[in-house]
Amino acid sequence: MADLSPVLQPHREGGSRYGYTMFPGLECESEAELSLSLARTKTRSYGSTASVAAPLSERYIEHRLSPSDTLQGIALKYGVTMEQIKRANKLFSTDCIFLRKSLNIPVISKKGSLFNGLGSLDSPENETQDNCNSPTKEPALAEAHTVSIPSSAKTNQPIVRSDEELSAKDFLQRLDLQIKRSTQAAQRLKEEDLRHDDSYATCSYQH
């Protein structure tokens, strides 16, 4: 006689032979852990949508767009590539620039050029700022390297020297003065000894 009993499915781990779970709390906990792990994982992005962390030597300049602007012209103006502008602004194509009012232009500072071998990509605005700041730096350098000019007897103006020159001159003058005083004192002692010896010799000769 054939066995007409229903075929039982193999039971899962932690479940009974009839297909239902013996411990429903464990299954809920495993599902919660799975959802948390999926939430923690970051979605990958490729191409221009990838968020690349800017290095310490990179900064951005805001460029106001005009109807005649093109991506190639902006890249040539600031000395950067089109891909860098696309990556910085997350652009998919060159036509997307007309949907924006401004673009962020990545600019590499001079500090970064020492490490990666690339030239400085400063914009013309920064060049004008550097030119404006340079006249203020030149007088400071000139003051640091001023040559000592002797004061005239008529004007009695103080001698202009830098701090380093003044301290070195003072030190050398003091050293020369101390040497001169010590040599003079040694000569005086020597002369006094000679006089004392002469007086003692004359006194002994008279007696």
Swiss-Prot record:
* SMART domains per the UniProt record, alphabetical: LysM
Q: Where is the composition biased (Basic and acidic residues)?
A: 188-199
Give residue ranges for domain LysM: 61-105
InterPro entries named in the record: LYSM1-4, LysM_dom, LysM_dom_sf
PANTHER family, per database record: AND PUTATIVE PEPTIDOGLYCAN-BINDING DOMAIN-CONTAINING PROTEIN 2-RELATED, LYSM AND PUTATIVE PEPTIDOGLYCAN-BINDING DOMAIN-CONTAINING PROTEIN
Please report the name of this protein according to its UniProt entry. LysM and putative peptidoglycan-binding domain-containing protein 2
Q: Name the encoding gene, please.
A: lysmd2
Map out region (Disordered) in residue numbers.
186-207
